[in-house]
Amino acid sequence: MRLYDTLSGGVRDFAPLRPGHVSIYLCGATVQGLPHIGHVRSGVAFDVLRRWLTAKGFDVAFIRNVTDIDDKILHKAADAGRPWWEWAATYERAFTAAYDALGVLPPSAEPRATGHITQMVELIERLIERGHAYTGDGDVYFSVATLPDYGKLSGHRIDDVHQGEGVATGKRDQRDFTLWKGAKPGEPSWPTPWGRGRPGWHTECVAMCESYLGAAFDIHAGGMDLVFPHHENEIAQAEAAGDGFARFWLHNGWVTMGGEKMSKSLGNVLAIPAVLQRVRAAELRYYLGSAHYRSMLEFSETALQDAAKAYAGIEDFLHRVRTRVGAVVPGEWTPKFGAALDDDLAVPAALAEVHAARAEGNRALDAGDHDTALTHAMSIRAMMGILGADPLDERWESRDETSAALAAVDVLVQAEVQRREDARARRDWAEADAIRDRLKEAGIEVTDTADGPQWSLLDGTDK
């Protein structure tokens, strides 16, 4: 198997540190708000990697963290008049619901940043002792100048680096980045040898990686927007602490709209509830996973409907075989399918094999060759199962699609409905109306009743 490693800048042969075992760390969500389809693409992409490695016989340890303490979380919770931990927990549930709706397997462990403060403090102490970090006005900073090859992941020249953290009086060098933030009034804080405070984002992931996977592990994954500064700063800390850290760095491309990254700050996000009105969850999963994980995925309604139609074609063939021939159990994937996934997870080529098998199977079925049709159907089930979208899997077939979508959407929407109620309680009518309008754009109608707010999909489905 070969994978593209961002650090080396090319495709390399992959072999795990421990034979038969693969360790993967995926940078998860900063739970500050509702997830959109851009957020969950990495979850789908690396779920395929995990499923493929498992199918090949590896024991996979898959860690996906939750960043539950962050400047944005604190600011948004404060603006809404809610405790920061409640805010984080609310949107953590929303992300979990989104992953589940799309059939992403639960991680082996899902550590929260706030549960690993002790490990972060210990890491920072090691960096200070080794001369790579220093204190200043209650904060702790990493000294970039002490690591000559800083920038090797992203290609940034060390002299051109600026961390963009604003003016900090305790910084010796504007290239340095924050490991620990000194306590501020009204913010959560924890005791440390250098005073109370809270962790910096880059420190959190290093501590959690090493807590669950050790000082050296196989794969660190995440979106391409994390290459700099987040992953660059993770490497800096780990190497400065004397650890080997990740052997492969994998990064998925963005979901774009109009050629720009899907982002709340750009106002071009597409909420999951809105998409689940147009296509089934399995079809959305198929769409998000159909492009090569490193490529950009430009969203369009046409592309979404084309993906739904392609998925429905696979589903229809499997149903035809089951009706005419009998039970269809997963069989063996084709050699070309396996070769495609071994070539840096080339899902488009793998899907071409699925559709070739479907076409041949349909011809065989029409000709009355039931044995050949069944063989192709069994192979398709195996291949689509590895891609997490087998139409005959109990996950997709046993649950009514509308009910399944509503169950996922309910968790996502309740978070925003609660925000609207909080705004109404503060008599912030403008904010309450803005939230209602955003929900409507996402395909959700909110109605105030004597029993409290009720929401419904604009297609008429009540909740």
Swiss-Prot record:
Compartment(s): Cytoplasm
Motif segment ('HIGH' region):
29-39
Record: residues binding Zn(2+): C27, C205, H230, E234
Residues reported in the UniProt entry to bind ATP: K264
Q: What Pfam families does the record point to? A: CysS_C (PF23493), DALR_2 (PF09190), tRNA-synt_1e (PF01406)
Q: Which cofactor does it need?
A: Zn(2+)
Reported EC number(s) for this entry are: 6.1.1.16
InterPro entries (alphabetical): Cys-tRNA-ligase, Cys-tRNA-synt_Ia_DALR, Cys-tRNA/MSH_ligase, CysS_C, Rossmann-like_a/b/a_fold, tRNA-synt_1_cat_dom, tRNAsynth_Ia_anticodon-bd
Q: Where is this motif: 'KMSKS' region?
A: 261-265
User: How is this protein annotated for GO cellular component?
Assistant: cytosol
First-listed, main subcellular location of the protein, grouped into a coarse class: cytoplasm
GO biological process per UniProt: cysteinyl-tRNA aminoacylation
Catalyses: tRNA(Cys) + L-cysteine + ATP = L-cysteinyl-tRNA(Cys) + AMP + diphosphate
Gene Ontology MF terms: ATP binding; cysteine-tRNA ligase activity; zinc ion binding
What interactions and quaternary structure are annotated?
Answer: Monomer.
The family line of this record is: Belongs to the class-I aminoacyl-tRNA synthetase family.
Q: What name has this protein been given in UniProt?
A: Cysteine--tRNA ligase
Which organism is this protein's natural source?
Answer: Mycolicibacterium vanbaalenii (strain DSM 7251 / JCM 13017 / BCRC 16820 / KCTC 9966 / NRRL B-24157 / PYR-1) (Mycobacterium vanbaalenii)
